[in-house]
């Protein structure tokens, strides 16, 4: 049985307890598809998909169905017997740099889109709502890129509000990690999805006014020991010397020729001056707001989960 922490709004599971909740949900991903979803340095395999992500997809599927029934009941109360469209179900995925939240979001998108009841599943990252580099420089906050103030939070809130309100077409800016900037004149078009997954560092933040987290129907925080995340970040940084950094167009091309020692020192400097302070000050404090916390071990595997009951 899962462990109840009394008094607590959460119920905790180990992996064996959680995987039993998959029931008969079929595994619909292939190894080839999973390779395309797996982020650099991530170790996720089909066993983890079956034991962790399929129960999660089943839970969300049940909640989407319940939310659709609630929407229909409200429409009946209002006398609207033929509502134009159901309200999109919005999922937030948060966590530190290098913790694997992008892989979590992509795998979840692939699984949820297999259900006939909600085949249209869109994934948007908040990177697109970073201010362009020129604006960050104008505000003298280029060194704070990734911190809450570096995002166009009003634009992000407006985007999610319009999607949630059923707008036929909503656009989001597109960010290039290669160029380290917003791509001019390029947009991500979202057209009335059944489910919208919003992935980013700070999506669970709260404030004195309406925040994007207030519009979530379900939220996930990908968690791990800080020491492990730092090591994953450094390992990824070193690996990128022969992948994205090697591209002459990359903003970080100057890192491509660094030795292991030089690259490790550079990664540690970035981690301790930017990523760690942002994690401690802004990201980690939002963890209690998540509907579900996925806890990773040092080998990247998810072995503990904490689900909010209320």
From Swiss-Prot:
Q: What does the entry list as the binding residues for ATP?
A: 95-102
Q: What is its main location?
A: cytoplasm
Q: Which reaction does it catalyse?
A: (R)-pantothenate + ATP = (R)-4'-phosphopantothenate + ADP + H(+)
Give me the segments passing through the membrane: none
Source organism per UniProt: Mycobacteroides abscessus (strain ATCC 19977 / DSM 44196 / CCUG 20993 / CIP 104536 / JCM 13569 / NCTC 13031 / TMC 1543 / L948)
EC number assigned by the record: 2.7.1.33
Mind telling me which HAMAP family this protein's record contains?
Pantothen_kinase_1
Matching entries from SUPFAM superfamilies are given as: P-loop containing nucleoside triphosphate hydrolases (SSF52540)
Q: Which GO terms describe its molecular function?
A: ATP binding; pantothenate kinase activity
GO cellular component annotations of the record = cytoplasm
User: What gene is behind this protein?
Assistant: coaA
Q: Which domain of life is it from?
A: Bacteria
Q: What class of enzyme is it?
A: transferase
Q: Which family does it belong to?
A: Belongs to the prokaryotic pantothenate kinase family.
Q: Where in the cell is it found?
A: Cytoplasm
Record Gene3D superfamilies: P-loop containing nucleotide triphosphate hydrolases
Q: In its UniProt record, which GO terms are filed under biological process?
A: coenzyme A biosynthetic process
| Pathway linked to the protein | Cofactor biosynthesis; coenzyme A biosynthesis; CoA from (R)-pantothenate: step 1/5
Protein name, entry field: Pantothenate kinase
Q: What keywords sit in the KW lines?
A: ATP-binding, Coenzyme A biosynthesis, Cytoplasm, Kinase, Nucleotide-binding, Transferase
């Amino acid at each position: 049985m899962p462990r109840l922490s009394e008094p607590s709004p959460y119920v905790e599971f180990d992996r064996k307890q959680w995987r039993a909740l998959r029931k008969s949900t079929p595994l619909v991903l292939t190894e080839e598809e999973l390779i395309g979803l797996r982020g650099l340095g991530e170790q996720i395999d089909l066993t983890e998909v079956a034991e962790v992500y399929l129960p999660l997809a089943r839970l969300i599927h049940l909640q989407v169905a319940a939310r659709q029934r609630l929407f229909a009941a409200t429409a009946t109360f209002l006398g609207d017997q033929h509502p134009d469209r159901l309200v999109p179900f919005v999922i937030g995925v948060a966590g530190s740099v290098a913790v694997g939240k992008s892989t979590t979001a992509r795998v979840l998108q692939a699984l949820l889109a297999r259900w006939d009841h909600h085949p249209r599943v869109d994934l948007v990252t908040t990177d697109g709502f970073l201010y362009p580099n020129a604006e960050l420089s104008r505000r003298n906050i280029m060194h704070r890129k990734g911190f809450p103030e570096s995002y166009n939070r009003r634009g992000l809130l407006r985007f999610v509000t319009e999607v949630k309100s059923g707008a036929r077409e909503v656009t989001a800016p597109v960010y290039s990690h290669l160029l380290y900037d917003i791509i001019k004149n390029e947009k991500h078009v979202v057209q009335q999805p059944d489910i919208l997954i919003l992935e980013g560092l700070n999506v669970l933040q709260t404030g004195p006014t309406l925040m994007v987290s207030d519009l979530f129907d379900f939220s996930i925080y990908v968690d791990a020991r800080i020491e492990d995340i730092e090591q994953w970040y450094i390992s990824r940084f070193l690996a990128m010397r022969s992948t994205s950094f090697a591209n002459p167009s990359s903003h970080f091309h100057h890192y491509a020729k660094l030795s292991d020692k030089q690259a490790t020192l550079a990664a540690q400097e970035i981690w301790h001056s930017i990523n760690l302070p942002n994690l401690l000050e802004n990201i980690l404090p939002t963890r209690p707001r998540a509907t579900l916390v996925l806890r990773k071990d040092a080998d990247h595997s998810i072995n503990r989960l904490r689900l909010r009951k209320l």
